[in-house]
């Protein structure tokens, strides 16, 4: 089949990752959705070779990118180059839903690294 259709609701409930790429059979680039619970501080991380484009679908995200903090409302887009440190925080009382698209020259494998595993691993596991 040349296309697939789904919704975030079909990919899971509650907070955490929605494996969009796997569910829809996407192979050309990485793509996931993340549902952040209220007042959640995500992991500070970077990638070896994969740039990421973030789309704020619902809510308000605070992006900290190389120490620069930006508040991004629903409908906003943020592009972060691979090795640039980034962290997403939901400082609101409502859920935050973000779509993340990543890739580099067709590379779609997982290549993320936590900046401070002692601090960031529990944050990452909080979105399991």
Label each PLM-derived region with a short phrase:
Residues 27, 64-68:
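Short strand-coil-strand connectors
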Residues 34, 60, 68-70:
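Well-ordered beta-strand scaffold positions
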Residues 67-83:
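Short acidic-glycine-tyrosine-enriched beta hairpin
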């Amino acid at each position: 089949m040349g296309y697939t259709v789904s919704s975030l609701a079909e990919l899971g409930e509650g907070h955490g990752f929605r494996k969009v790429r796997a569910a829809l059979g996407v192979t050309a680039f990485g793509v996931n959705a993340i549902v952040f619970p209220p007042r959640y501080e995500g992991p500070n991380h970077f990638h070896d070779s994969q740039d990421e484009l973030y789309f704020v679908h619902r809510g308000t995200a605070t992006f900290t990118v190389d120490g620069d903090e930006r508040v991004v409302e629903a409908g906003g887009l943020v592009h972060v180059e691979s090795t640039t440190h980034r962290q997403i925080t939901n400082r609101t009382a409502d859920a935050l839903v973000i779509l993340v698209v990543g890739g580099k020259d067709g590379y779609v494998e997982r290549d993320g690294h936590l900046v401070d595993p002692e601090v960031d691993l529990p944050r990452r596991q909080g979105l399991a």
